[in-house]
Amino acid sequence: MKSPSSLAFLTEALRRLPGVGPKSAQRMAYHLMQHDRDGAAMLGRALSQAVERVQHCAMCNTFTESAVCETCLDAERNAALLCVVETPGDQLMIEQTLTFKGLYFVLMGRLSPLDGIGPKDIHLEKLISRATDGIVQEVVLATNFTNEGEATAHYISETLKARGLKVSRLARGVPVGGELEYVDAGTIARAMLDRRTT
């Protein structure tokens, strides 16, 4: 028996989610159609609305529904301190620690030459422009402690130090190979407070 084309299309769409293989996608699609059609409709509306409304902040590159995000507009933030993260999820995790009061720049990825991801793909030119605006005094590199995250931090550090900026890195405490999105807030808070100059 072959699945109806619309169900096959839904299954294929669900496979695009990270960590979802063909069997999991098929189970989700069948569950939504069999047991939770209201949930399926809500999911469809939410996806459409997010795709239509969510854009990148003109200053920090994170997700927002306006030209500039609330964090960048917050006059209480320390504009001399810029934290560089890989994803909006990493930014959210740092925010939840309540230890960082500066601004952010979200790379939307990390360097990975094997996957064809280079400096342009992580918005390095935009980061350099932001970091050298005359306001930023220190750049905190909060990329993940994976091989790609470390390589990204090193590349950015060398690039910014060559322009006379102070660059620091989150202290260890975040496990090697760990991604910030999956680390508890206390560990991230300690790493932020114990960051070191690179």
UniProtKB/Swiss-Prot annotation:
Protein name: Recombination protein RecR
PANTHER family the UniProt entry points to: RECOMBINATION PROTEIN RECR
One MF term in the entry's GO annotations: zinc ion binding
UniProt family annotation: Belongs to the RecR family.
Keywords attached to this entry: DNA damage, DNA recombination, DNA repair, Metal-binding, Zinc, Zinc-finger
Keyword Metal-binding among record annotations: yes
Any one Pfam family match given in the protein's UniProt record, by short name: RecR_HhH
SUPFAM superfamilies linked: Recombination protein RecR
Record function comment: May play a role in DNA repair. It seems to be involved in an RecBC-independent recombinational process of DNA repair. It may act with RecF and RecO.
Occurrences of domain Toprim (ranges): 80-175
InterPro entries associated with the record: DNA_Rcmb_RecR (IPR000093), Rcmb_RecR (IPR023627), Rcmb_RecR_Znf (IPR015967), TOPRIM_dom (IPR006171), TOPRIM_RecR (IPR034137)
Presence of keyword Phosphoprotein: no
Gene Ontology BP terms: DNA recombination; DNA repair
NCBIfam families: recR
UniProt zinc finger (C4-type) residues: 57-72
